[in-house]
């Protein structure tokens, strides 16, 4: 476990700048998310969202969650705090609004290869004149809530912020399920996990980050997601104005293709810290925090009236309830998730019952620290090591 102060980071940054002087093309840049309020008819299937997160990592989706997702028994109309925050990316001749996902390794988007009925409301990927279609290559992704997408693969120009590559694998959707079609705010996904889990067949392709990291001042990106506001991604540098205190670093485990790491314990509310650490993944593409059953149960035991609802497919409670904070211990650093972040959303439009931002990992064997956790932190994803850095947001 290594801790860097802002001063040390500045010295390191100056050292890097000096050593990189002969290579003026190297750079760093910031790209902001934007709010994409969905149309008035859009709804969010909460157990469906939960099921997709479990299936993404090979977990077993409980029958109660499957049934709740299929029946639409916990479907809510997003309010302001549930807007989607997406990132504009130039792909081929198009600008798409993509979900940046550190838990997957594909760059895919809605395309003009889809039937016209499935294109409505979405920006579409159209290959540039210089694009090359990879003959015999394909991709196919499916999730636990029944959603899926598949199609062809191109090599094309992609620009994110100030960096462009003309050799990025772009996965063009030619088939897509209704779950994605209905989400008109979102045009696809840009994966930031390790390239080893890219799903393109017959040969996996590199992620955008792996393709362009040699152009960056440092082979890293940092994430500052925000509660009730668009977040920011910094590529190639660390912005010390976005965090307080010091950044605590820990080794990242990339053996499964994810940004995995080991925690050193946790605490709930004002309680003392447990020394029982757990293995976790830092995932911007998962909304919730998914933990071992004993931790989840311990958390909701401190929430008056909380119960595990078969109908809703997860833990629920009165929306007016004050929830305890949840703290993850990483070395000497304590990453605090405010209780208000864990009060995720009403289980249905106008309901006074809310769905918890912490849910069970269903025996997955590791915990997923998704956006509910990340919105309290400034997180550095450094491919050298690799390693992860955590600090409280400024």
Curated annotation (Swiss-Prot):
GO terms for biological process: proteolysis. The keyword rRNA-binding does not apply. Residues 21-69 form a propeptide. The keyword Hydrolase applies. Keywords: Aspartyl protease, Disulfide bond, Hydrolase, Protease, Secreted, Signal, Zymogen. Residues 1-20 form the signal peptide. Secreted aspartic endopeptidase that allows assimilation of proteinaceous substrates. The scissile peptide bond is attacked by a nucleophilic water molecule activated by two aspartic residues in the active site. Shows a broad primary substrate specificity. Favors hydrophobic residues at the P1 and P1' positions, but also accepts a lysine residue in the P1 position, leading to the activation of trypsinogen and chymotrypsinogen A. This is Aspergillopepsin-1. It comes from Aspergillus niger. The lineage of its organism: Eukaryota, Fungi, Dikarya, Ascomycota, Pezizomycotina. The gene is pepA.
């Amino acid at each position: 476990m290594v801790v860097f102060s802002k001063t040390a980071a500045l010295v390191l940054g100056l050292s890097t700048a000096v050593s990189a002087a002969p290579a003026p093309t190297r750079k760093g840049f910031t790209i902001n998310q934007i709010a994409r309020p969905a149309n008035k008819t859009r709804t969010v299937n909460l157990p469906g969202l939960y099921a997709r997160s479990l299936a993404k990592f090979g977990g077993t989706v409980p029958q109660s969650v499957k049934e709740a997702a299929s029946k639409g028994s916990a479907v809510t109309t997003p309010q302001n705090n549930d807007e989607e925050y997406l990132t504009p990316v130039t792909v081929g001749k198009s600008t798409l609004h993509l979900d940046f996902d550190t838990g997957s390794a594909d760059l895919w988007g809605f395309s003009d290869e889809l039937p016209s009925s499935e294109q409505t409301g979405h920006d579409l990927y159209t290959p540039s004149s210089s694009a090359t279609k990879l003959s015999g290559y394909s991709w196919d992704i499916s999730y636990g809530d029944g959603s899926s997408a598949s199609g062809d693969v191109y090599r094309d120009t992609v620009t994110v912020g100030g960096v462009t590559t003309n050799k990025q694998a772009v996965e063009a959707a030619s088939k897509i399920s209704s779950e994605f079609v209905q989400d008109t705010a979102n045009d696809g996904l840009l994966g930031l996990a390790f390239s080893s889990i890219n799903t393109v067949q017959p040969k996996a392709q590199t992620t955008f980050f792996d393709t362009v990291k040699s152009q960056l001042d440092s082979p890293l990106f940092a994430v500052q997601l925000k509660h009730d506001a668009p977040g920011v991604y910094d590529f190639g540098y660390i912005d010390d104005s976005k965090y307080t205190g010091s950044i605590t670093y820990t080794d990242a485990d990339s053996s499964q293709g994810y940004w995995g790491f080991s925690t050193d314990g946790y605490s709930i509310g004002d309680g003392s810290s447990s020394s029982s650490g757990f293995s976790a993944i830092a995932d911007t593409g998962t909304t919730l925090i998914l933990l071992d059953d004993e931790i989840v149960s311990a958390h909701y035991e401190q929430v008056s009236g909380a119960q595990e609802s078969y109908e809703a497919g997860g833990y629920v409670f009165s929306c007016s309830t004050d929830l305890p904070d949840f703290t993850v211990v990483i070395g000497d650093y304590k990453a605090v998730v405010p209780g208000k972040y864990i009060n995720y959303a009403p289980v249905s439009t106008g309901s006074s019952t809310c769905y918890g931002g912490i849910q069970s990992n269903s025996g997955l064997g590791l915990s997923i620290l998704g956006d509910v956790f990340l919105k309290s932190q400034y997180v550095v994803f450094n491919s050298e090591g690799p390693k992860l850095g955590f600090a409280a947001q400024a």
